[in-house]
């Protein structure tokens, strides 16, 4: 082959490589977005550094803690936990604080602020009000919705004074009438002061209760600042986002009405994959649905 021919072929190949670039859609799909509730990977968080690295690699940018104990997040001081998140380019948004009460609320608020969180989330009725029937695997609450509302308002007022926002996270039992005929979630929405208390809607548990998230958005617009996005399989079990039957597109179309500022993938239990595999599947599902 002549030298000129070889040069010509090389030139064509070079031009082909230069002209090739991924489409805008492909670039966008690689851009990190969305949040993960670390409860999903709670066991793996024993090795916080490695696990958070994998969370970031899966494409998430925001995180929600569910591992506060004795003044530490996942056995790290609030400052050290914040430093680790910064290193991984992950942003702390919300923290589930299941042990909050009137005696420790000030310390917990201080720790959340040091770690960089914005939202203080009450995951279940606090201060001994939550009950769980081990035999029937059924969650419930005692003490009544009025009592819970008063507690949340007091805790929320403390949070607001410190620059945090308090949210209450639902399960399914709040959507069932109690022994007095009251639907607890509706009582809370109608009686808690929105200056101090708003809500984190868990889309799976609302669906599990037989309720419609969009109906609640319409009835109580602007009150649902964070969503938990988790799917439901045909057996009613938890599933990676996009692998179940919940119509997230319809719900997402009503994002503005709901007041949603952030959302987090959460999967309480995994059945066909490990939690670290599930969060990758869910992130791809988010993108297909239209979350960003």
Residue map of PLM features:
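Active-site-proximal loop/turn and secondary-structure-junction residues that shape catalytic pockets
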Residues: 40-42, 67-69, 98-101, 126-128, ...
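Hydrophobic h-region of N-terminal signal peptides that target proteins for export
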Residues: 11-19
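Alpha-helical scaffolding within the catalytic cores
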Residues: 47-50, 75-81, 103-108, 152, ...
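A short helix->loop->beta-strand "cap" motif at the edges of active sites that frequently abuts
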Residues: 90, 117-118, 164, 257-261
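Conserved beta-strand positions in the central sheet of alpha/beta enzyme cores
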Residues: 64, 94, 121, 167, ...
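Active-site acidic/histidine proton-transfer and metal-coordination neighborhood
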Residues: 102-198
């Amino acid at each position: 082959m002549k030298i000129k021919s070889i040069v010509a072929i090389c030139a064509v190949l070079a031009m082909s490589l230069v002209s090739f670039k991924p489409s805008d859609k492909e670039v966008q799909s690689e851009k990190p977005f969305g949040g993960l509730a670390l409860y999903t990977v709670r066991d793996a968080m024993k090795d916080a550094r490695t696990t958070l690295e994998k969370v970031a690699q899966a494409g998430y940018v925001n995180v929600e803690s569910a591992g506060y104990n004795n003044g530490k997040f996942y056995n790290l001081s609030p400052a050290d936990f914040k430093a680790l998140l910064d290193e991984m380019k992950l942003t702390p948004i919300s923290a589930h604080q299941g042990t909050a009460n009137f005696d420790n609320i000030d310390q917990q608020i201080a720790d959340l602020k040091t770690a960089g969180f914005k939202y203080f989330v009450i995951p279940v009725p606090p201060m001994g009000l939550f009950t769980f029937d081990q035999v029937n695997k059924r969650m419930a609450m005692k003490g009544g919705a009025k009592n819970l509302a008063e507690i949340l308002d007091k805790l929320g007022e403390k949070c607001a004074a410190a620059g945090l926002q308090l949210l209450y996270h639902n399960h399914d039992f709040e959507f069932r009438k109690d022994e007095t005929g009251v639907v607890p979630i509706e009582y809370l929405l109608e009686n808690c002061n929105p200056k101090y208390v708003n809500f984190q809607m868990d889309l799976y548990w609302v669906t599990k209760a037989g309720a419609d998230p969009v109906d609640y958005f319409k009835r109580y617009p602007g009150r649902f600042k964070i969503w938990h996005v988790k799917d439901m399989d045909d057996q009613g079990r938890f599933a990676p986002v996009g692998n179940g039957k919940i119509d997230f597109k319809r719900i997402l179309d009503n994002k503005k009405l709901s007041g949603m500022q952030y959302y987090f993938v959460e999967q309480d239990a995994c059945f066909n994959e490990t939690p670290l595999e599930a969060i990758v599947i869910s992130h791809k599902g988010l993108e297909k649905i239209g979350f960003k």
